[in-house]
Curated annotation (Swiss-Prot):
It is an enzyme of class 2 (transferase). It is found in: Cytoplasm. This is Adenine phosphoribosyltransferase. The keyword Transferase applies. Homodimer. GO terms for cellular component: cytoplasm. Its EC number is 2.4.2.7. GO terms for biological process: adenine salvage; AMP salvage; purine ribonucleoside salvage. CDD domains: PRTases_typeI. GO terms for molecular function: adenine binding; adenine phosphoribosyltransferase activity; AMP binding. Pfam families: Pribosyltran. Its main location: cytoplasm. InterPro entries: Ade_phspho_trans, PRibTrfase_dom, PRTase-like, UPRTase/APRTase.
Amino acid sequence: MMDAVRARIRDVPDFPKKGIVFKDITPVLSDPHTFREVIDAFVGRWKGERVDKVIGIESRGFIFAAPIAYALGAGFTIVRKPGKLPWETIREVYALEYGEGALELHIDAIGPGDRVLVVDDVLATGGTAGAAGRLVARQGAELLGYSFLAELSFLNGARQLGHAKVHSLLTF
């Protein structure tokens, strides 16, 4: 089922820096049939569960999270890099290969009792997704799990996400 999607993801060597093979998902997005197949697959995984909010991780997570939220009848919210959200936020810091990064969430975006799904395009090391999950927990909400278009399994990112459900449409 995902063969057409896999075929549209292209490898771009040495991007954004030498030694990295970047997974370019833009051909998936530009083809309406493939894009619909991806969204339908995401929705199919979570349709039987009560999802109150879907969080999209900046920035490509937004592309998938918004239509998933719409299809599930859930709210859509975003986590962004520091200083990009206009209202009061909470911040979660996470480790990068060289240094650290951070994500922010509006303090009123989710709350106690909300059942939350976190969505991003690619699961690599798990640092960014894990930070988003910790933001959910800090707000007293329930983390249902994570969904990704692709997982780079050789980086073992799912291990960084604890016991949460991890749903990846494709594995590389």
